[in-house]
Swiss-Prot record:
Pathway: Steroid metabolism; ergosterol biosynthesis. It is a single-pass membrane protein. GO terms for biological process: ergosterol biosynthetic process. It comes from Aspergillus fumigatus (strain ATCC MYA-4609 / CBS 101355 / FGSC A1100 / Af293) (Neosartorya fumigata). Its EC number is 5.-.-.-. This is C-8 sterol isomerase erg2.
């Protein structure tokens, strides 16, 4: 009669199979716990974002309007006016007063930016171009406020037949999760303020480098200044 005992090789195979299965279940369990903790932490912090903000959209809009009234079409003077007042009103040395202009390619649009502030929950920049640009706004994890200082910005959403028009002194509020086509006609500069979760927005800012421009020196400059400001602000307890 044939033997009913299993061979050592088949026993070993069953043990290895059982071990792999148990290991996979443990990994899945750890992953599920991690995702649950992350989701709970995100929900907790997201509901309390207001306590981390140091800028106010209404004040920035008022400041932009006063800069325009004081300096007309002199954008250089408007930038100085804005930074000087913010330096007086925002405590804690959270501003970058070294005016470092960097090209920015994102969503097909190209311009230049000066990063005044960057942290985990906010950024404030001067963004614009002297020759015009057009592109995709991106779909972001933060509210974005474009305070137009010079020139005109227009925007379009599907289903409408007329553009949204934003002349100097107005604010274009791109709400969190919304998306538009936008254009800065000819020379146009804005004080741009974002509040919400800033790090996920960096993927949008980096994508054009890898898919189009291959301008890695500019990518490095953006990373260096943004990272420096975010880390510096974290060390100063600005989340």
């Amino acid at each position: 009669m044939p033997s009913k005992s299993s061979s050592p090789q088949s026993n070993s195979t069953r043990k290895n199979s059982c071990g792999c299965c148990c290991f996979s279940v443990r990994k899945f369990g750890f992953l599920a716990v991690f995702v649950a903790i992350f989701a709970a932490l995100y929900s907790y912090l997201d509901a309390r974002l207001e306590q981390f903000y140091i800028f106010n959209p209404e004040h920035l809009h008022d400041l932009s309007q006063r800069a325009i009234q004081a300096h007309g079409n002199d954008t250089r003077a408007m930038v100085d006016f804005i930074v000087a007042e913010l330096d007086q009103k925002i405590p804690g040395n959270h501003l970058n007063k070294n005016e470092e202009w960097i090209f920015n390619n994102a969503g097909g649009a190209m311009g230049a930016m000066y990063i005044i502030h960057a942290s985990i929950t906010e950024y404030l920049i001067i963004f614009g171009t002297a020759i015009g640009t057009e592109g995709h706004t991106g779909r972001h994890t933060a509210d974005d406020y474009f305070n137009i200082l010079q020139g005109t910005q227009v925007a379009f959403v599907p289903g409408t037949f007329e553009p949204e028009v934003y002349p100097p002194g107005t604010v274009h509020h791109l709400r969190r999760g919304e998306v538009k086509q936008y254009k800065m006609e000819q020379s146009c500069f804005a004080l741009e303020y974002a509040r919400g979760w800033i790090p996920p927005m960096l993927f949008f800012g980096y994508a054009d480098t890898f898919t189009s421009t291959l301008d890695f020196p500019t990518l490095w400059a953006t990373t260096r200044v943004t990272g420096r400001e975010m880390i510096t602000n974290l060390l100063r307890r600005k989340f």
